[in-house]
Amino acid sequence: MSGQRQRIAILPGKDGSGNRTSSAGAATYKESCDLIDLSSYKEIQMSDDEDVVNSSLVICQAKVTMEELVRYTMRSKNMIPKVVAEFRNITVGGAISGAALESTSHKYGQFMDTVAWIKVLTGSGEIVTTNKGDSLWCSLSGTYGSMGIVLEAALECVPATPYVQVSYYAFDSVEHGIKALLDVVSEKRHVFLDGLTFPPQQVPLQSVEDQNPANRRGTVVMQGEMIGSFEDPPRIQGWKCKVHGGSFYYEHVRDLLNEHFRKARKRNNLKSDRTTVEAFFQEVIYMEDYLFRYDYGAFWMARPMAFEPNKLLSYFPFIICLFIASYRWVRIVTGSMFTTKTMFKILKQAPESVVAKRMVVQDCYIPPETVNGFLSWVYRSIPISTPIWLCPVLFNNNQPFTPSYKKQNQSKPTVSAPVMINCGIYGRVSDGRGAYYTQQLEAMCEQLGGRKMLYAQNHYTESDFWRIFDQTIYDVLRESHHATEAFPSLYEKTCGVAEWKNTWVEAIMSLFL
């Protein structure tokens, strides 16, 4: 490697778990690179380490998926990694490079924060081991392989049970839901924590004069605790991931919330203050089903496509079939289409310009002080009718390219919880202005002191991008780790511009998205 001129990138996987992201530049930068095949890097083993307090380490190679990781650690030691990314086929290398998170992130931070050490292929051709807190370790998360290529990592694990008891708390405004999330973070008692806020099309609420209509959204906060054992399983169990004929998890939560509000309206005693309301529903979910609850349906991106009956005849029959394929009763036959592994395979066949026009898929990390204003703006400005995922994440001050990064000299938050709120905004737009809405999101996110993840469509100018991600620090670190000439830059990897060519392929694919 040290003597060759061609830059290096990872060969995309053939199983749907590969390294091609949905970012606009993902399909182009690898064309000028020599590609390294890591498909055989799938070994896992447990290793006790007395230096890691209250945890054990699992040593796994870069291409191990989250599903393989969880099944191995549960089977070997009844443990799970401290943070498990939400999709079954996300790889360990991808979770590190892409700054993955999930519902334990309020407690442990992002996936990278639970990594004890990493073996990295550097630009000089050496394989080095970097430990937590080292310069290279701090540079890897959020840089998408532009600092070095992850080969192997040691992840911290914690004891686990086979079941999770999930408690659901209902709120009739997003402000109350956010407050509840922050209150739970401050309590530092719960293992799993996230929330969903629903649009009025899915969770209709009665009007209240003294509330901001934009923020009046049915919102649910979910708290999870580990319970039970294989020898003594709970008698009452709840939602299960059933690929054929089962409900998407968000549908299950939405139905619970609607039923709760219906009963509350009937009793005329709906309350919004978390200090006076108890969980309206509890259920027990298998650990694996809970960890990957958003995998089936890709959160809600596989939701049934809505169309007006009077326009039905304007659709071709095969497109009508596509529209109805994701309805629950049809999933008895079509269910296997809606795992993320299959959905991303299909999505990657679509021209990136079509994806940019038709979809808004973004994760924006927003400080607690400004998150309510951010969500109000999203509701007013982006025409999607899907839920928004709310997931608190501990901020860090040593990984400068992650969305959860907070400089040490930044002003202290006015709330007690040391977290950012990840707002997962995933939806389709019918007017073909997805790229415009994404640009507006990028600007608003920065304006309110946040950062977004870079795995999806990005439309930053180069100057705006390097203002946010500090090119001076980035270039110094790239040079010190011999990455400058060896790997494409972070901007090249994530911010290519997709052009709309009006080809017949794009015209047809635009009907599907």
What do the predicted segments below correspond to?
Residues 1-513:
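Noncatalytic alpha-helical scaffold of FAD-dependent oxidoreductases
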